[in-house]
A protein has these predicted regions:
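Non-catalytic interaction-recognition regions
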Residues: 1-243
């Protein structure tokens, strides 16, 4: 069942009684004349997202700001609706849906935007060079040893965990299809975004001076961003160029 939070009702101009304002959610009811169109939600989300985008990126043209706001709004709504299991009450709330923190579409989109920004700042051949170096593991003893060192300890364990999580995408999609439960994919996408953000904050990918270690970090970031982008696309959510 889809409902609205009292705050969302007020934002949409739906009049509520004092009793309704105290409820956790307001059920939509045609009989009572309470209803909302998806377009109304998108339009309101776009307005709020545009304000944030214009503040963060005043250098963008109006058209670019509007396009970015639309992508964020659609991502926010789709993720919010998909993150709940089929038998749950979906109490839509604008502030919660558009938050850049927590289990939201914008949070997942922002993680992918961050990942893409890494590769815009790196040399255009950095990824190919990293993959070429990693490809020598097993045939070159020195490189194998250095890669092993880069993947040792707690940091290495976290890198492996991110890689293994990213590689589970196909498995998760298959499970969701079998169970007809897209909420599982939404949860996986959030977990992958959160794992990447942790990786992003703990490692100096662009500034890393050790060539082998940087190659490991670049390869890991690429795997994570490709799988995160694919997971979002499966949910019908695109990744803006900037957020």
């Amino acid at each position: 069942m889809v409902a609205l939070s009292p705050a969302a009702c007020e934002e949409l101009g739906i009049q509520l009684s004092e009793e309704d304002r105290k409820k956790p959610y307001i059920e939509m009811s045609g009989r009572k004349g309470l209803g909302v169109k998806a377009d109304d939600l998108i339009n309101r989300l776009e307005e709020d997202a545009l304000t944030e985008v214009a503040t963060r990126h005043p250098q963008l043209s109006v058209e670019e700001q509007s396009a970015t706001a639309h992508e964020i709004a659609v991502g926010a709504l789709r993720y919010f609706l998909l993150k709940f299991t089929r038998n749950s009450v979906i109490a839509f709330d604008f502030k919660e849906a558009l938050s850049f923190e927590g289990e939201t579409g914008p949070y997942c989109q922002y993680a992918a935007v961050r990942a893409n920004s890494i590769f815009r700042k790196l040399d255009e051949n950095a990824l190919n060079s990293a993959n070429e170096l990693i490809g020598k593991v097993g045939s070159d003893k020195d490189i194998s040893a250095k890669v092993g060192e880069a993947l040792a300890g707690e940091a290495g364990t976290e890198i492996w965990a991110l890689i293994m999580l990213a590689q589970r995408l196909d498995e998760v999609i298959a499970q969701c299809a079998a169970a007809a439960e897209p909420a599982n994919l939404a949860k996986y996408t959030f977990n992958l975004a959160r794992a990447f953000n942790l990786f992003y904050h703990r490692h100096r990918i662009i500034a890393e001076e050790d060539r082998t270690r940087q190659a490991v970090l670049i390869a890991t970031a690429d795997i994570a961003r490709r799988q995160l982008t694919a997971a979002l696309a499966t949910l019908g959510i695109s990744v803006p160029e900037r957020m």
